[in-house]
Amino acid sequence: MNKTYLPSTTSLEPKWYVVDATEQHLGRLATQIAMILRGKTKPIYTPSMDTGDFVIVVNAEKVAVTGKKRTQKIYRRHSGRPGGMKTETFAKLQSRLPERIIEHAVKGMLPKNTLGRNLFTKLKVYAGPDHPHQAQKPEVLTLKTIAGA
């Protein structure tokens, strides 16, 4: 039986990518971002290590959903107090905090453990077209989430 390949932590140099969420389908965009965060697109991928890259998402306010999700999809949060459940539709949350929609979708696709929480910190989401990470020299990554486009 072969041993699992473990890359040394010194050989891991994460890249920075910029993704434009304008008119991208939410779920398809989130799956591709989650794969980049985990490092599954690299040949040195190891399930128990952080081999992923940083992802900057811009124009989160322009992300698209299909069907009636804009009015029927509900986001819930709880304050921890009795009766503290708050619900909000996709449209209301998009107008109030558009970054949270993409963060919520990607977070659900990452592992639910310490590694997943560390991977989530590599995701940077911004509502508008500007971001403060120019010093990292991020590469523009074009993701095709619409079939045939």
Curated annotation (Swiss-Prot):
Signal peptide: none annotated. One of its GO terms (biological process) is translation. InterPro entries: Ribosomal_uL13, Ribosomal_uL13_bac-type, Ribosomal_uL13_CS, Ribosomal_uL13_sf. The keyword Protein biosynthesis does not apply. GO terms for molecular function: mRNA binding; structural constituent of ribosome. PROSITE patterns: RIBOSOMAL_L13 (PS00783). Keywords: Ribonucleoprotein, Ribosomal protein. The keyword Methyltransferase does not apply. Pfam families: Ribosomal_L13. GO terms for cellular component: cytosolic large ribosomal subunit. It comes from the Bacteria. Belongs to the universal ribosomal protein uL13 family. Part of the 50S ribosomal subunit. This protein is one of the early assembly proteins of the 50S ribosomal subunit, although it is not seen to bind rRNA by itself. It is important during the early stages of 50S assembly. This is Large ribosomal subunit protein uL13. The gene is rplM.
